[in-house]
């Protein structure tokens, strides 16, 4: 069996497998099909190799592993014990004839039927709560796959053949998880504006996660929460910056069911233990979640939809998430509603929250101004970081990362203007590791940095009427060098001499003109007289 040897070749091979679907639907639709089938192959391959090793008949060949599995599964003497071990260790079972390897064999024989794959999906979903409804967004009988059942069958079979040669089980854990992340990022690029609901660009995720973990990289059992988790990309960055990644406990909430299922798959592919993931499919701005311990977290990371609509029902004034701040976020701009939800779930001691929002939250008035003032009076806002424009897939507007903490001993706010920290990309601006490092170093120092960072006292903020617009605090104006007056006079004289020379040349040419009639000649002479002054 052909296998990919490096993460980059795996990434490319996975992306190439999308070619079959790319001509039939847009990326926002075909991502569910491709990612779902990759996930099914991962579960199938992992199971086959697990059985072969458990029965002490280890092999690198999926076909041989399937043969081992089939023999023990169909043997009445070993069937019950094998199923028991698989349920205990894997939490799922795929029948031999429904494994990805068996289905691909039928594809090659020309006997594959879509119902076989659909049954495999159903069996996984019914095997454990962890997998419930996981494949519900994958409609194998959609007209998008083909106008007829035969065409639909052919499309799915072609994708399966592309995926069959990939060694996904051999790349299990972070490499496969990162490959999945790569695909999600590629889909985000292809999807354009639709991508914002499920993906946070890695440089921004990296910045926010490192800030959340700063000084706590060695902490065991670090709890992290994203109330608008999308595909889980932002949450899963924790694995990269915790020195005890297997002990990190993840809490996430997502409204969109398709995206929620994507996050569930992403967690499993990254090898997050079942007992360390708590994901919820619901509206963050409706009933509160989580409501059972733990309800407060070491880190809160959020990239909510910007200026979204929400109910802003007056009943929320009695909700402990919002009631301390006297006002509700406007119905047409839920930004502060998301922020206050996340802040409510932050631990009192040493909790750190990072949220990405549009700049309007820094200076808009009315209800938002009241909420902002209350947060500042409480000392909740620790740092404001201005990001470059056009770094997100779903918007070109500049955004800000706001860092919040509870129980601070002062109320100053550190401002970082990182709006120029980017490289120009083909369609978007790109923040590099060097840009992120510059921001992090400033954040750690909280020192004055000319044209980049400023530590504003609470008194200074009050003087600015609680307006946090970054240019009020960080002056990035570049003075132009003043040219000496003698140089300016010299240039004026040179210009005047050039004008005189050109005027003389023009007059010489005009003097050679003659009118074709006495009237025209008189008119021309009058013009020359006026021109000479």
Predicted regions and their residues:
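Non-catalytic, mostly N-terminal accessory regions of nucleic-acid modification and defense proteins
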Residues: 1-212, 275-284, 386-389, 411-419, ...
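A conserved structural/catalytic subdomain of Rossmann-like adenosyl-cofactor enzymes
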Residues: 5, 287, 294-533
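Hydrophobic alpha-helical segments and their boundary regions
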Residues: 6-7, 25, 170, 185, ...
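Hydrophobic helix-cap positions at the C-terminus of alpha-helices
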Residues: 21, 215, 345-346
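Residue-level signal for short amphipathic helical patches enriched in basic/charged
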Residues: 28, 171, 219, 245, ...
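Conserved S-adenosyl-L-methionine
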Residues: 194-302, 307-316, 322-328, 336-337, ...
């Amino acid at each position: 069996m052909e296998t990919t040897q490096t993460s980059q070749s795996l990434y490319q091979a996975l992306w190439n497998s999308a070619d079959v679907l790319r001509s039939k639907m847009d990326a926002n639709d075909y991502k569910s099909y491709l990612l779902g089938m990759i996930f099914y192959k991962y579960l199938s391959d992992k199971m086959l190799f697990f059985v072969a090793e458990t029965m002490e008949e280890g092999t690198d060949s999926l076909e041989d592993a399937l043969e081992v599995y089939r023999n023990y599964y169909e043997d009445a003497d070993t069937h019950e014990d094998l199923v028991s071990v698989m349920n205990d260790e894997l939490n799922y079972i795929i029948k031999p004839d429904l494994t990805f390897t068996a289905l691909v064999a039928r594809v090659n024989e020309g006997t594959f039927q879509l119902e076989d794959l659909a049954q495999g999906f159903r069996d996984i979903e019914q095997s454990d709560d962890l997998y419930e409804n996981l494949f519900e967004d994958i409609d194998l009988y959609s007209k998008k796959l083909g106008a007829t059942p035969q065409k639909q069958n052919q499309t799915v079979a072609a994708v399966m053949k592309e995926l069959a040669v990939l060694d996904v089980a051999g790349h299990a854990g972070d490499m496969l998880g990162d490959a999945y992340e790569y695909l999600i990022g590629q889909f985000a690029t292809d999807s354009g504006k639709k991508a914002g609901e499920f993906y946070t660009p890695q440089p921004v995720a990296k910045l926010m996660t490192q800030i959340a973990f700063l000084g706590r990289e060695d902490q065991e059992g670090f709890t992290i929460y994203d109330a608008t988790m999308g595909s889980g990309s932002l949450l899963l960055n924790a694995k990269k910056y915790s020195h005890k990644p297997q002990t990190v406990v993840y809490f996430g909430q997502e409204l969109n069911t398709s995206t929620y299922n994507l996050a569930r798959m992403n967690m499993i592919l990254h090898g997050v233990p079942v007992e360390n993931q708590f994901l919820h499919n619901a509206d963050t701005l409706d009933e509160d979640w989580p409501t059972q311990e733990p309800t407060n977290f070491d880190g809160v990371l959020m990239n909510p939809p910007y200026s979204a609509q929400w109910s802003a029902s007056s009943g929320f004034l009695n909700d402990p998430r919002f009631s301390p701040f006297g006002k509700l976020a406007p119905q047409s701009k839920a930004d502060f509603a998301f922020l206050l939800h996340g802040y409510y779930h932050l631990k009192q001691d040493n909790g750190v929250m990072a949220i990405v929002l549009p700049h309007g939250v820094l200076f808009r008035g009315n209800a938002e101004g009241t909420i902002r003032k209350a947060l500042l009076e409480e000392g909740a806002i620790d740092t404001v970081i201005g990001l470059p424009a056009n770094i997100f897939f779903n918007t070109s507007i500049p955004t800000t990362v706001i860092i919040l903490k509870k129980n601070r001993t002062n109320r100053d706010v550190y401002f970082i203007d990182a709006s120029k920290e980017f490289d120009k990309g083909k369609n978007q601006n790109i923040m590099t590791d060097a840009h992120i490092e510059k921001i992090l170093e400033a954040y750690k120092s909280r020192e004055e940095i000319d044209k980049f960072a400023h530590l504003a006292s609470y008194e200074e903020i009050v003087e600015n009427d609680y307006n946090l617009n970054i240019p009020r605090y960080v002056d990035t104006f570049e003075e132009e060098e003043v040219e000496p007056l003698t140089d300016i006079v010299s240039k004026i004289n040179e210009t005047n001499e050039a004008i005189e020379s050109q005027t003389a040349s023009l007059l010489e040419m005009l003097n050679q003109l003659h009118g074709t009639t006495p009237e025209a000649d008189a008119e021309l002479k009058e013009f020359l007289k006026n021109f000479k002054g």
